[in-house]
Amino acid sequence: MKFVLAVHGTRGDVEPCAAVGVELRRRGHAVHMAVPPNLIEFVESAGLTGVAYGPDSDEQINTVAAFVRNLTRAQNPLNLARAVKELFVEGWAEMGTTLTTLADGADLVMTGQTYHGVAANVAEYYDIPAAALHHFPMQVNGQIAIPSIPTPATLVRATMKVSWRLYAYVSKDADRAQRRELGLPPAPAPAVRRLAERGAPEIQAYDPVFFPGLAAEWSDRRPFVGPLTMELHSEPNEELESWIAAGTPPIYFGFGSTPVQTPVQTLAMISDVCAQLGERALIYSPAANSTRIRHADHVKRVGLVNYSTILPKCRAVVHHGGAGTTAAGLRAGMPTLILWDVADQPIWAGAVQRLKVGSAKRFTNITRGSLLKELRSILAPECAARAREISTRMTRPTAAVTAAADLLEATARQTPGSTPSSSPGR
């Protein structure tokens, strides 16, 4: 069968879809990925075929971060509305053209968490099954929590409903234009509802342990498979292994694709606080910054690392709150501090706090004093014990990928508008 996996976002958004793609290819299927241009090399390094899909996601995440920072400033409401619309529909027309070409002859089209309408329209045009893969709870529910904000279930549901209506409003013109280009009639409902009515499963690529009650609230059409990762095996780093073995387990710090506005000052703060605690720090540092920043001996800077081999050798993890890093840290049984900023990061921060496996604070509000306080809290024995207990309740990587691939195969065999007769178990 031919599977087309269309996903836009950062590496953390693309990797779960690529992990399923690798498994489908292993099973003998033809797999084609549509990803941001800056991540084509990433998916091709896994042996998958990639084509450019939408704008550069590194540039886009910088734009989103700047947009969020500017929300508190007084500005023209019309300019604000225009900026929101541009963020959500940038590249829609070109993405539609790309996906229409790529999906010719496909048995299934899968979308990631954004630009659902692009994939929904293409699947409808070819009358083929569709699916979605979500790595945090996107649909309306009453189970998520945001740090420092009261979040009763009724308020959570109401807020999410408003958010979806806003998204439908800002994307309707782009959606209409794509449908006209494809010769489709005006859409009777928003894209997410159209996907649901066509029987598209919404695969939840995270563990329900993070959101107690969510699996019961949702139907079988939103099956949980667990966090998806490609389990990439980087080249052995003897220098890093030697540094880790030479002292006490370090605290890992990494902020993924989230832009750090003051990397030099941030590194100095981490170094000073860890020195005060008598801890060592292992810090992910992008190559562009690595050679320009000096640091003390108790600090080690690294590039991309294999989480499955390195994190279990650490004492705790501090990160931006991406879904993949959150899952990797807790799979390793690590107490966690999330310094969140944008997108789904506050949702994971809230989950970590609610599970009592760590703490959370907005990145822009962190100071030496508050970082010291938060690290002391997650290094407490009871927090570490709770993190180890939660790790035993998480789905293993191979089981998660297998379940997701099984679901996509079953969906591809269905007539659009029906649902798979059964879902694979966890």
From Swiss-Prot:
Gene Ontology molecular function: hexosyltransferase activity; UDP-glycosyltransferase activity
Protein family per UniProt: To M.leprae L518_C2_147 and M.tuberculosis Rv1524.
Highest taxon in the source lineage: Bacteria
UniProt-listed GO biological process terms: carbohydrate metabolic process; lipid glycosylation; vancomycin biosynthetic process
The protein's name: Uncharacterized protein MT1577
SUPFAM superfamilies: UDP-Glycosyltransferase/glycogen phosphorylase
UniProt xrefs under InterPro entries: EryCIII-like_C, Glycosyltransferase_28, GlycoTrans_28_N, UDP_glucos_trans
